Amino acid sequence: MAKKSMIAREVKRQALVERYAEQRAELKAQGDYIGLSKLPRNSSAVRLHNRCSITGRPHGYIGKFGISRIKFRDLAHKGQIPGVKKASW
């Protein structure tokens, strides 16, 4: 489990990215790179890192489900992810 501060930091970054998305797009379209540099650093989508929504784990992230491979396996075995079943051939 990731530290609570790391999870909170990532949530804060996500909020900043959403807040400044339109403004960043306009400045980028105009080519105003000085204006872009004056925006907060964490408002750039490049600074986001994919994290598991349950544990905050940064590695082994499955984007389609928004969780790590470990939690995915656990929830899939319990049948808590709709449409997912163990492969057999």
UniProtKB/Swiss-Prot annotation:
One of its GO terms (cellular component) is cytoplasm. One of its GO terms (biological process) is translation. Disulfide bonds: none annotated. The keyword tRNA-binding does not apply. InterPro entries: Ribosomal_uS14, Ribosomal_uS14_bac/plastid, Ribosomal_uS14_CS, Ribosomal_uS14_sf. SUPFAM superfamilies: Glucocorticoid receptor-like (DNA-binding domain). Pfam families: Ribosomal_S14. Keywords: Ribonucleoprotein, Ribosomal protein, RNA-binding, rRNA-binding. Binds 16S rRNA, required for the assembly of 30S particles and may also be responsible for determining the conformation of the 16S rRNA at the A site. HAMAP family: Ribosomal_uS14_1. PANTHER family: 30S RIBOSOMAL PROTEIN S14, SMALL RIBOSOMAL SUBUNIT PROTEIN US14M. This is Small ribosomal subunit protein uS14. The lineage of its organism: Bacteria, Bacillati, Bacillota, Bacilli, Bacillales.
